[in-house]
Amino acid sequence: MIDRFRRIVDVVAAAAGLLVTSPLLLGAAVATRLSAGRGVVYRQRRLGLAGRPFELLKFRSMRHPAPGREGPEFDAERMTRVGQWMRATSLDELPSLWNLLRGEITLVGPRPLPVHYWDRFVGDEYERFEVRPGITGLAQINGRNAVDWPERLAFDVTYVRTRTLRGDLRILIETVPAVLGRSGVDQADGVTMHELPADRSRSGPPTR
């Protein structure tokens, strides 16, 4: 019943969000095209509920990489000024309202991570896939990208184990000042978010 209520809220929020922000979506699309070139909407395969992959939609915030200049360490040089501003204000996330409408993500939950991370989690970190990934979550109101991986994943597991509707409402409310204050957008060295290390000790991922 609670999950059904969450889904109803997601659909209403997505539909209302797409309607209200349609002029902003158009303006952001034009600005992205002028600053980053072709491919206004960036599609990346992410891990969803139970580890099932889906395509997350975002506005492109970086120029296409030059040969040999790919990876998080080159984020700063590829980031456009428009993209930097949109990422700081989370406007690059607006296209993900379509993912919300389709039920691939929810308003509150662990952030969806790239599919190639599946083998890199340790032990109970896989509990984060027991719920749909979210637009915002416990880690996002406690440091966002500035939080290191072990702490960030611990926040995700804590959320899954303790989530309530009241807790979701608190996270949504606290997301507003976190976004407006543009806190935790990048890590200390200027990288948006370092890769989750591939050599973490583990017993192996569960079967999807």
Protein language model features and the residues they cover:
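Positions in alpha-helical segments
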Residues: 14, 42, 80-84, 116, ...
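A short, structured surface patch at a secondary-structure boundary
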Residues: 75-132, 172-175, 179
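Short, conserved catalytic or interaction motifs in soluble domains
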Residues: 64, 110, 162
